[in-house]
């Protein structure tokens, strides 16, 4: 294989590997923004509620929380992150939206 072709091929492989997850991130972020999640949560720092990365760090290693978090989102929560954080119920979200948000948050 010619060196130029090899370099070109090798340099595009990482970009191809990142394309899929980037699209998932954008979709999840847009959904979180559209549904008002960003009014209280941020990606890398606590705002009114805990950051998405802190939520992911706490729960991603526990498979049972992938099933529990939809109930927390839908029903609201208090005390999971101390007395300061109270999340209001988000009952207007569809099952599919809640599942997409849980998957996206846990991927952070």
Where are these regions (language model features)?
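Positively charged n-region of N-terminal signal peptides that target proteins for export
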Residues: 1-4
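Bacterial N-terminal signal peptides
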Residues: 6-15
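Stable alpha-helical elements in mature extracytoplasmic
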Residues: 24, 28, 44, 65, ...
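Axial heme c-ligation environment in periplasmic c-type cytochrome domains
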Residues: 50-56, 74-102
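Electrostatic cytochrome c docking/interface patches
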Residues: 15-32, 58, 62
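Protein kinase-like catalytic domain
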Residues: 41, 74, 105-106
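The canonical Cys-X-X-Cys-His
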Residues: 35-44, 101
């Amino acid at each position: 294989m010619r060196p130029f072709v090899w370099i070109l091929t090798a340099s595009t492989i990482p970009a191809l590997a990142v394309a899929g997850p980037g699209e998932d991130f954008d979709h999840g972020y847009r959904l979180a923004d559209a549904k008002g999640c960003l009014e209280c949560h941020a990606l890398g720092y606590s705002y009114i509620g805990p950051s998405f990365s802190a939520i992911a760090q706490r729960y991603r290693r526990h498979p049972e929380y992938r099933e529990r978090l939809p109930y927390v989102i839908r029903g609201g929560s208090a005390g999971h992150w101390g007395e300061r954080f109270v999340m209001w119920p988000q009952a207007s979200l569809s099952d599919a939206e809640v599942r997409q948000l849980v998957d996206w948050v846990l991927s952070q």
